[in-house]
């Protein structure tokens, strides 16, 4: 751009100097006009670099050029002046409407110069002027192409800057995602450790505590009553066996939790329970289980495990049924056994733990028990809205 700047100024000043060679010595008006034109060209050349009022400075340059052609009709030097003016005009990138208006005005001025030239010299210089004007057109095309090239460079720079900013933002997002994934992994590991610790504490830990109490009681009964001691030994064996069963069932449940298919996990769990406990178990599913969130799978599996264990251990059930219903709004899980039932029973560790797991997911569990009519676990999980509810075991004991 600097080269074009100085070349334009050099061309205009040289053209003005060449006009001095054709002016007669007694034509003082010609000298004054050339000096004024050169001064205005120089001033406009500096002012044209500003963004404001650029169109007016271009119009002044065009008017000065055609004025030289009108004042000195016997030479085509004014066309040389118009060449850098045309380049500068199209280089500014004016709107199409403005450009066409200026072209129409320039055509009128050029036609005026041609008429004056024809009136004074005939066809001698008119044809030369028309031929030379093609160079002005060529310079205008060159200026337009340079403007497009500069616009393309500006667009490329802007796109490169945007691409660089996007790359930096993407790198930062990738780093944040990596840190987030690491945090999720750590939190998942902590959650699993806490969950396993809670399972051990609430199941095996409870049994081992009861076993320790019975062993301490056994020591006292050995000194006082051998029959009571034998009964206590039987209780200790039962507690130890139940604790071992809890450990085995917990291990199998943890293995099934890693299975991506919830239905297959529940089927395997009920099948193992049927084989080990000798309880007839029925498992039914309605709706599409694919809508169940993965985060809810362990809770459903643990709920079924705890309900089946209680059915055999506390209810002495011979048959159990599991019904899983899936809708777009909620998940319903009902486990019912045909055990002896106990409507007056308080919530033990297993049932309380079951309610805690459901509450973590905004679910609700109700326990229904009727004497000699078994025990029912009703679990509801809303997929649209979370709901927290608290209440005791519902009693349905008949007065017979």
Curated annotation (Swiss-Prot):
Record keyword Phosphoprotein present: yes
Residues found modified as Phosphohistidine: 201
Matching Gene3D superfamilies: 1.20.5.1930, Histidine kinase-like ATPase, C-terminal domain
Record localization: Cell membrane
CDD domains: HATPase_UhpB-NarQ-NarX-like
Entry's EC annotation: 2.7.13.3
Catalytically driven reaction(s): ATP + protein L-histidine = ADP + protein N-phospho-L-histidine
PTMs per UniProt: Autophosphorylated.
Alphabetical UniProt keywords: ATP-binding, Cell membrane, Kinase, Membrane, Nucleotide-binding, Phosphoprotein, Transferase, Transmembrane, Transmembrane helix, Two-component regulatory system
Superkingdom: Bacteria
Annotated GO MF terms: ATP binding; phosphorelay sensor kinase activity; protein dimerization activity; protein kinase activity
Cytoplasmic side: 24-27, 83-101, 147-400
Histidine kinase domain: residues covered: 190-385
GO CC annotations, alphabetized: plasma membrane
Transmembrane segments: 3-23, 28-48, 62-82, 102-122, 126-146
Extracellular side: 1-2, 49-61, 123-125
Membrane topology of the entry: Multi-pass membrane protein
Listed InterPro entries: HATPase_C_sf (IPR036890), Sensor_HK_TwoCompSys (IPR050482), Sig_transdc_His_kin_sub3_dim/P (IPR011712)
Phenotype reported upon loss of the gene: Deletion mutant does not show any observable phenotype.
Role noted for this protein: Required for resistance to linearmycins, a family of antibiotic-specialized metabolites produced by some streptomycetes. Member of the two-component regulatory system LnrJ/LnrK, which induces expression of the LnrLMN ABC transporter in response to linearmycins and other polyenes. Acts as a specific sensor for linearmycin, either directly through binding or indirectly through membrane perturbation. Probably activates LnrK by phosphorylation. May also promote biofilm formation.
Protein name: Sensor histidine kinase LnrJ
Species: Bacillus subtilis (strain 168)
């Amino acid at each position: 751009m600097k080269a074009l700047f100085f070349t334009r100024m050099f061309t205009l000043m040289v053209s003005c100097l060449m006009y001095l060679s054709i002016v007669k010595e007694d034509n003082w008006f010609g000298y004054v006009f050339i000096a004024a034109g050169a001064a205005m060209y120089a001033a406009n050349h500096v002012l044209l670099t500003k963004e404001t009022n650029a169109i007016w400075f271009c119009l002044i340059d065009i008017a000065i050029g055609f004025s030289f052609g009108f004042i000195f009709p016997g030479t085509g030097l004014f066309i040389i002046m118009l060449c850098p003016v045309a380049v500068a005009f199209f280089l500014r990138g004016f709107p199409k409407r403005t450009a066409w208006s200026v072209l129409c005005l320039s055509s009128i001025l050029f036609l005026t110069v041609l008429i004056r030239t024809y009136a004074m010299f005939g066809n001698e210089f008119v044809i030369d002027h028309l031929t030379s004007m093609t160079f002005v057109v060529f310079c205008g095309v060159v200026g337009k192409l340079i403007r497009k090239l500069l616009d393309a460079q500006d667009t490329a720079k802007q796109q490169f800057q945007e691409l660089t900013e996007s790359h930096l933002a993407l790198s930062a997002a990738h780093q944040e995602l990596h840190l987030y994934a690491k945090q999720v992994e750590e939190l998942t590991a902590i959650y699993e450790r806490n969950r396993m610790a809670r399972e051990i504490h609430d199941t095996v830990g409870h049994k081992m505590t009861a076993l320790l109490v019975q062993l301490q009681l056994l020591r006292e009964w050995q000194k006082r009553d051998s029959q009571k001691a034998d009964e206590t030994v039987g209780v200790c064996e039962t507690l130890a066996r139940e604790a071992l069963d809890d450990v085995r069932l917990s291990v199998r449940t943890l293995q099934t939790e890693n299975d991506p298919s919830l239905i297959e996990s529940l089927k395997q769990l009920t099948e193992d329970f049927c084989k080990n406990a000798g309880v007839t178990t029925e498992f039914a599913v309605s709706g599409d289980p694919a809508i169940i969130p993965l985060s809810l799978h362990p809770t459903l599996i643990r709920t079924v495990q705890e309900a089946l264990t209680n059915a055999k251990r506390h209810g002495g059930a011979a048959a159990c049924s599991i019904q899983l219903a899936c809708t777009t709004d909620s998940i319903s899980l009902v486990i019912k056994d045909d055990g002896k039932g106990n409507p007056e029973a308080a919530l033990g560790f297993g049932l309380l733990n079951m309610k805690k797991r459901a509450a973590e997911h905004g679910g609700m569990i109700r326990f229904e028990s009727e004497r000699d009519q078994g025990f029912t676990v009703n679990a509801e999980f809303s997929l649209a809205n979370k709901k927290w509810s608290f209440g005791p075991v519902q009693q349905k004991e008949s007065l017979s």
